């Protein structure tokens, strides 16, 4: 596997084909658990681990599973790995496990995981499949983390609250409160606020992509000379 392959998989997972911002998969946990940083980070890490491990497992058994039972077999693999993560969370982060509730076992039905198993892991070697799962999971976790951080900050006026649920007593004083007198904005931590914030993040990503595409056209000389000066001044092609 070449360095170019690694870079391409990383770009797809983190930005170009991000599960949360581009594919719009896994929206149920993405919107349901992103009301705080600790919830978002906990579910994001769990999903990333299941995705990386399931991709590796599917790649290993892809030649031994017939076409007729491929999807049920993949679901069983994902369910087994999700159960392992669930048991680990019960043992080490039980309070966070209770907070996340049904969203941990629901990782089994996350479309991101089954989609990567079917579209990528079943057609590639273990190394490529594992790296794809890791980067896709990381991209999903980062969207969860950004969304959770923004919603917590706007809704409660804090950041990194209750991080001891994930990292233990040492993280009890990680809480940041930039605006001590802030009364909070209830909409931000409710489901409608999650939809609004996700929509704004998607719009921001699309705008960045458009700007990068316009700059690439200018650098490649595809923009007429009469427009180049305006692009340099405003950054926009009209």
Curated annotation (Swiss-Prot):
The chain crosses the membrane at residues 41-61, 71-91, 95-115, 130-150, 184-204. Its EC number is 7.-.-.-. One of its GO terms (cellular component) is plasma membrane. Signal peptide: none annotated. Its main location: membrane. GO terms for biological process: electron transport chain. It comes from the Bacteria. It is found in: Cell inner membrane. Disulfide bonds: none annotated. It is an enzyme of class 7 (translocase). InterPro entries: NqrDE/RnfAE, RnfE. It is a multi-pass membrane protein. Keywords: Cell inner membrane, Cell membrane, Electron transport, Membrane, Translocase, Transmembrane, Transmembrane helix, Transport. Part of a membrane-bound complex that couples electron transfer with translocation of ions across the membrane. The complex is composed of six subunits: RnfA, RnfB, RnfC, RnfD, RnfE and RnfG. Belongs to the NqrDE/RnfAE family. This is Ion-translocating oxidoreductase complex subunit E. It comes from Pseudomonas aeruginosa (strain UCBPP-PA14). The gene is rnfE.
């Amino acid at each position: 596997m070449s360095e170019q392959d690694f870079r391409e998989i990383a770009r797809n997972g983190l930005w170009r084909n991000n599960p949360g911002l581009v594919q719009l998969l896994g929206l149920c946990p993405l919107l349901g658990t992103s009301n705080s940083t600790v919830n978002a980070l906990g579910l994001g890490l769990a999903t990333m681990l299941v995705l990386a491990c399931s991709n590796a497992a599917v790649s290993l058994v892809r030649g031994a599973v017939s076409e007729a039972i491929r999807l049920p077999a993949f679901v069983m693999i994902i369910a087994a790995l999700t159960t392992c993560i669930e048991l680990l969370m019960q043992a080490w982060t039980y309070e966070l496990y209770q907070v996340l509730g049904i969203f941990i076992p629901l990782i089994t039905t996350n479309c991101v995981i089954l989609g990567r198993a079917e579209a990528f892991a079943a057609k590639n070697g273990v190394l490529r499949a594992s790296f794809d799962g890791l980067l896709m999971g990381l991209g999903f976790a980062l969207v969860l983390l950004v969304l959770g951080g923004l919603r917590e900050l706007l809704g409660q006026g804090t950041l990194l609250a209750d991080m001891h649920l994930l990292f233990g007593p040492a993280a009890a004083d990680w809480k940041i409160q930039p605006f001590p007198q802030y009364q909070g904005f209830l909409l931000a931590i409710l489901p409608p606020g999650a939809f609004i914030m996700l929509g704004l993040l998607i719009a921001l990503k699309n705008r960045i992509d458009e700007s990068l595409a316009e700059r690439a056209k200018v650098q490649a000389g595809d923009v007429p000379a009469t427009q180049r000066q305006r692009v340099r001044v405003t950054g926009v092609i009209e």
